[in-house]
Amino acid sequence: MAEVSIDQSKLPGVKEVCRDFAVLEDHTLAHSLQEQEIEHHLASNVQRNRLVQHDLQVAKQLQEEDLKAQAQLQKRYKDLEQQDCEIAQEIQEKLAIEAERRRIQEKKDEDIARLLQEKELQEEKKRKKHFPEFPATRAYADSYYYEDGGMKPRVMKEAVSTPSRMAHRDQEWYDAEIARKLQEEELLATQVDMRAAQVAQDEEIARLLMAEEKKAYKKAKEREKSSLDKRKQDPEWKPKTAKAANSKSKESDEPHHSKNERPARPPPPIMTDGEDADYTHFTNQQSSTRHFSKSESSHKGFHYKH
């Protein structure tokens, strides 16, 4: 292979080559910086445009919401105004009806007053026919009437107020009668409740007394059983039982009692001193309780009779 020959005389120097490389490097760096600046500017423009578009959308949405709120507010104002108009119309109609009713009532009152006046005039004429009047009384009576037969306002008011007074008196009497009946019903209900409460209380006392008697009877049976068990353990008990058996056989030979006679009550069990004291205390307490309940029930029954 043939070698390429290089002319050494035409080669540039080292400094020139370094300077050319530095210029080339600076040019490349400037070009890259310029491209970065252009890209950054484009990116910032894109971001700005996006923000502007977003802001426009938000502003448009807010404007639409504001318009909707204003439209709803105006609609609400219109509805309220319409309701107020309807209420005012209803009130006006009610006032008109009330005025018409008042006018009719006034007309009725005037008719009643006129009828009362005519009736009074007729009665006055009848009295004049039966009894002669004195001049002073006639002058005083004529002063209440007009020449055409009408009544003065004060007399008309008295004539109108007469039926209202009678109606008020009837209403008071009716209210008093209703109050009296209600009071009687309340007293009867109270008496019935008191009697029912007394009956329930007596039943409860009887139930408690029966339960106490059952408990006392059970305790007495248990004590009798325990005393019999103790006696069985005692060696001296057998002769006594034999004597009791002989006495029972003798009693069985005797004639029986009639059915109408009450059977004899069994003898109480033999108790110790402590048990005897407890039983007497219980019987005394039970008898006092019975006496108190009977006296209380009789007192309450007497109170109910009164």
Swiss-Prot record:
Q: Which residue ranges have biased composition labelled Polar residues?
A: 281-290
Q: Name one GO molecular function term.
A: ubiquitin protein ligase binding
| Compartment(s) of residence | Cytoplasm
Annotated coiled-coil segments of the chain: 63-130
Q: Establish whether keyword Ribonucleoprotein is in the entry.
A: no
GO CC terms in record: ciliary basal body; cytoplasm; cytosol
* Bias (Basic and acidic residues): 215-239, 248-264
* The organism's place on the tree of life at top rank: Eukaryota
Tissue expression pattern: Isoform 1 and isoform 2 are coexpressed in placenta, liver, lung, kidney and pancreas. Only isoform 1 is detected in skeletal muscle, brain and heart.
Location of N-acetylalanine modifications = 2
Q: Name one GO biological process term.
A: sensory perception of sound
Keyword terms: Acetylation, Coiled coil, Cytoplasm, Deafness, Non-syndromic deafness, Phosphoprotein
Modifications after synthesis and translation: Phosphorylated on tyrosine residues.
Segments of this protein annotated with the region Disordered: 215-306
- Report any Pfam family annotated for this entry: CCDC50_N
- Phosphoserine-modified residues are 5
> Known PANTHER family for this protein?
C3ORF6 PROTEIN-RELATED, COILED-COIL DOMAIN-CONTAINING PROTEIN 50
UniProt disease annotation:
Deafness, autosomal dominant, 44: A form of non-syndromic deafness characterized by initially moderate hearing loss that affects mainly low to mid frequencies. Later, it progresses to involve all the frequencies and leads to a profound hearing loss by the 6th decade.
This chain's function reads: Involved in EGFR signaling.
Extra facts? Found in a critical region of hereditary spastic paraplegia (HSP) SPG14 locus. No causative CCDC50 mutations were found in HSP families.
What is the protein's quaternary organization? Answer: Interacts with RNF126.
Kindly provide the name given to this protein in its UniProt entry.
Answer: Coiled-coil domain-containing protein 50
**Could you tell me which species this protein originates from?**
Homo sapiens (Human)
Q: Which gene encodes it?
A: CCDC50
